[in-house]
């Protein structure tokens, strides 16, 4: 591809992911809190539910959610926010998760250990006669099972509390497809949409998040063979480079190539289930 081709695709992706050219953290806080409040009221439901991992994304989305239900209550609408801890056994960075909960200050906190359910599903697959090709493949699939079990737990609580499940996907993760389809990607509302990673961090900082939360190394921590593996190691590019791409800045050719490869390979993750009416005929 030529430089002009790269730039053209970059502009199209930025528009698709709704990344604004201008950014003001305080304005984004006000806009997103209002969005969350208006949406919950419009549904007639009463509760927001979100899993808190300890990272900056869930911490930021959680604090925005809590502020939105407080705004609703001040306006006379009964609303609550439930923050869920969803460890797989003992979480390696549990101290970070507890720090995040203290920052979010949710109306209610629940802890559900997903390990028994995730391990049971893996065991059931083995009992069926299914065999994985390698231990690494099994570990990867098991990691996605954990992510989906976490969403099962959140929807169970939402179903019992007249609730809506919040997701933490933002423009950088959406660009790279770095989420589990129907796991952490399977939510009802995405208050961080349109923000790249550095802007999520700026919002967290403006909300009063301490630097240990704001600058925590992002990790999905789903694979037991590679615990706490940083997202950037999986990407092969840094969040700064991804964020530059999303802000329309020029990046190195290898960054363009890597970002576009991830974006194209994960297109199906950003789409609703396909039907024959969606599939191109040409």
UniProtKB/Swiss-Prot annotation:
Domain of life: Bacteria
Pathway: Cofactor biosynthesis; NAD(+) biosynthesis; NAD(+) from deamido-NAD(+) (ammonia route): step 1/1
This protein's record includes keyword Calcium: no
Catalytic activity reported: deamido-NAD(+) + NH4(+) + ATP = AMP + diphosphate + NAD(+) + H(+)
Disulfide cysteine pairs (residue numbers): none
UniProt: deamido-NAD(+) binding residues: 148, 181, 188, 268-269
UniProt-annotated binding residues for ATP: 51-58, 168, 197, 219
GO biological process, one term: NAD biosynthetic process
UniProt: Mg(2+) binding residues: 57, 173
Enzyme class at the top of the EC tree: ligase
Role according to the record: Catalyzes the ATP-dependent amidation of deamido-NAD to form NAD. Uses ammonia as a nitrogen source.
Subunit relationships: Homodimer.
Name of the protein: NH(3)-dependent NAD(+) synthetase
């Amino acid at each position: 591809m030529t430089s002009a081709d790269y730039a053209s695709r970059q502009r199209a992706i930025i528009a698709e992911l709704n990344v604004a050219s201008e950014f003001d953290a305080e304005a984004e806080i006000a806009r997103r809190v209002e969005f969350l409040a208006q949406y919950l009221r419009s549904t007639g439901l009463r509760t927001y539910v979100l899993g808190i991992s300890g990272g900056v994304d869930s911490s930021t989305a959680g604090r925005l959610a809590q502020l939105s239900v407080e705004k609703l209550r001040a306006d006379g609408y009964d609303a609550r926010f439930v923050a869920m801890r969803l460890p797989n056994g003992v979480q390696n960075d549990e101290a970070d998760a507890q720090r995040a909960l203290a920052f979010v200050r949710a109306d209610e906190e629940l802890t559900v250990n997903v390990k028994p359910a995730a391990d049971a599903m893996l065991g059931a697959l083995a009992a069926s006669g299914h065999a994985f090709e390698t231990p690494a493949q099994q570990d990867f699939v098991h990691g996605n099972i954990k992510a989906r079990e976490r969403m099962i737990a959140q929807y169970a609580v939402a179903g019992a509390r007249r609730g809506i499940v919040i997701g933490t996907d933002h423009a950088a993760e959406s660009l790279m497809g770095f989420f589990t389809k129907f796991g952490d990607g399977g939510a009802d509302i995405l208050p961080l949409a349109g923000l790249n990673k550095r802007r999520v961090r700026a919002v967290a900082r403006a909300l009063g998040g301490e630097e240990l939360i704001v600058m925590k190394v992002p990790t999905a921590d789903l694979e037991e063979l590679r615990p706490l593996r940083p997202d950037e190691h999986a990407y092969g590019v840094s969040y700064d480079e991804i964020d530059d791409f999303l802000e329309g800045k020029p990046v190195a050719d290898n960054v363009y190539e890597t970002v576009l490869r991830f974006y194209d390979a994960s297109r199906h993750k950003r789409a609703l289930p396909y039907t024959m009416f969606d599939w191109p005929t040409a």
